[in-house]
């Protein structure tokens, strides 16, 4: 009985510690989501003035975007990504993509040129993935005329900056393997690594899975998390 009692107490203590750890993770995510402007402390990053471009960049929640901007973001995503989705096991589903872009948890980086024309956006969220507090990048979409001028790299670097300032452990994103340009961009130019939750590492999907999950750790995520059980979020 004595041994069973000790084991029971140890299990209870472990559960309490796990709950406390998850509560701390959720608190960080909630604090990040309550910010008015995560980019506000870094005004120098609100301008991109190089390679013939003069862009202004703002960070806001989806609730602060007008319908015209939301429609533009959807159409740009469709133009850039529909074929890639159709070549994957996911397929292209317009209703689901629009719902994803307009989810109440969505944050945006919006880039405009000197005439206030919309030229690029990033859709991201502060969230919990597999027990870790993360900044999850859903979309990085650019109009053709501003590509290959450093805009995409600059926007992702902003994500890394905000992830550090909000004490997230890493920036995470999903990329199609057959989207060779994007895959090389994140792996080579930005030094993202294949995440431990990616199908090719976790073994959760077959070998012909068409996507990888990539990540880049912040200064708060130096030690990889030891996951148990299924991946799930909180704070919703």
From Swiss-Prot:
Protein's name according to its UniProt entry: N-alpha-acetyltransferase 40
Lipid attachment site numbers (N-myristoyl glycine): 2
SUPFAM superfamilies: Acyl-CoA N-acyltransferases (Nat)
InterPro entries: Acyl_CoA_acyltransferase, GNAT_dom, NAA40
Reactions performed catalytically: N-terminal L-seryl-[histone H4] + acetyl-CoA = N-terminal N(alpha)-acetyl-L-seryl-[histone H4] + CoA + H(+); N-terminal L-seryl-[histone H2A] + acetyl-CoA = N-terminal N(alpha)-acetyl-L-seryl-[histone H2A] + CoA + H(+)
Database matches in Gene3D superfamilies: 3.40.630.30
Main subcellular location: cytoplasm
Highest taxon of source: Eukaryota
Signal peptide: none
Cited PROSITE patterns: GNAT
Recorded coiled-coil stretches: none
GO terms for MF: histone H2A acetyltransferase activity; histone H4 acetyltransferase activity; protein N-terminal-serine acetyltransferase activity
Protein family according to the UniProt entry: Belongs to the acetyltransferase family. NAA40 subfamily.
Domain called N-acetyltransferase: residue spans: 63-217
Any Pfam family matching the protein: Acetyltransf_1
Species whose genome carries this gene: Xenopus laevis
Site (Essential for catalytic activity): 139
Binding sites annotated in the UniProt record for acetyl-CoA: 140-142, 148-153, 179
Keyword field: Acyltransferase, Cytoplasm, Lipoprotein, Myristate, Nucleus, Transferase
Role summary: N-alpha-acetyltransferase that specifically mediates the acetylation of the N-terminal residues of histones H4 and H2A. In contrast to other N-alpha-acetyltransferase, has a very specific selectivity for histones H4 and H2A N-terminus and specifically recognizes the 'Ser-Gly-Arg-Gly sequence'.
Record carries keyword Plastid: no
Localisation: Cytoplasm; Nucleus
Gene name in the database record: naa40
Binding-site list for substrate: 85, 127-129, 138, 174, 211
Its EC number(s): 2.3.1.257
